[in-house]
Amino acid sequence: MRLTQKQIVWLKVLLHLAGLLPFLWLVWAVNQGGLSADPVKDIQHFTGRTALKFLLATLLVSPLARYAKQPLLIRTRRLLGLWCFAWATLHLTSYALLELGINNLALLGQELITRPYLTLGIISWFILFALTLTSTQAAQRKLGKRWQRLHNFVYLVAILAPIHYLWSVKILSPQPVIYALLALVLLAWRYKTFRQWWRSFAGKML
């Protein structure tokens, strides 16, 4: 039984709640002292993990819609991508304002040099920014075939973001490994498309 348009609308409502509720919980935890002795790191990791969850959910939509024969599921992909960018922006903002401090933002360039994992994170954010700006139907019509080539760069984010997470933790724990493995599974699930994109991307880089 295929999902109806009305059910998709309700699904989008639930996805909006899934994007908003973690933020409300985080605000509550900060105000109630529900974080650890290093709340800045807690906030950074929480926002980053939530962004990763939405990234993985975005990557899951296309193969799930195809194999479950639910074409209307595709309509949730943009929403998930927007929430991914929103949480990635919160993640970047928490680092810039809470760790560096508003008076030390000029140090960001130096930080990118001394901490390469930050470079991977910044690259991922800029890609998500570009994908968000061009996520509308108007942008899709204007860009034509280039739109799909641009939005295939989400695959690069799916590679860089888990590496960024793995590299950033001082003590390796199962959680970043699980995210990395899930990203690999989702890329392998669309092996042909990913292989074509990778060959094109690698060819231009070399």
UniProtKB/Swiss-Prot annotation:
NCBIfam families membership: PRK05419.1-2 (NF003831), PRK05419.1-4 (NF003832)
Its biological purpose: Part of the MsrPQ system that repairs oxidized periplasmic proteins containing methionine sulfoxide residues (Met-O), using respiratory chain electrons. Thus protects these proteins from oxidative-stress damage caused by reactive species of oxygen and chlorine generated by the host defense mechanisms. MsrPQ is essential for the maintenance of envelope integrity under bleach stress, rescuing a wide series of structurally unrelated periplasmic proteins from methionine oxidation.
Compartment list: Cell inner membrane
Protein name as annotated: Protein-methionine-sulfoxide reductase heme-binding subunit MsrQ
Pfam families xref list: Ferric_reduct
GO molecular function: electron transfer activity; FMN binding; heme binding; metal ion binding; oxidoreductase activity, acting on diphenols and related substances as donors
Paired cysteines (S-S): none
UniProt membrane topology term: Multi-pass membrane protein
Membrane-spanning intervals of the chain: 8-28, 82-102, 116-136, 153-173
Keywords attached to this entry: Cell inner membrane, Cell membrane, Electron transport, Flavoprotein, FMN, Heme, Iron, Membrane, Metal-binding, Transmembrane, Transmembrane helix, Transport
Organism of provenance: Citrobacter koseri (strain ATCC BAA-895 / CDC 4225-83 / SGSC4696)
Name of encoding gene: msrQ
Cofactor stoichiometry and binding remark: Binds 1 FMN per subunit. Binds 1 heme b (iron(II)-protoporphyrin IX) group per subunit.
Cofactor(s) listed in the protein's UniProt record: FMN; heme b
Subunit structure: Heterodimer of a catalytic subunit (MsrP) and a heme-binding subunit (MsrQ).
Family recorded in the similarity comment: Belongs to the MsrQ family.
Keyword Transmembrane helix on entry: yes
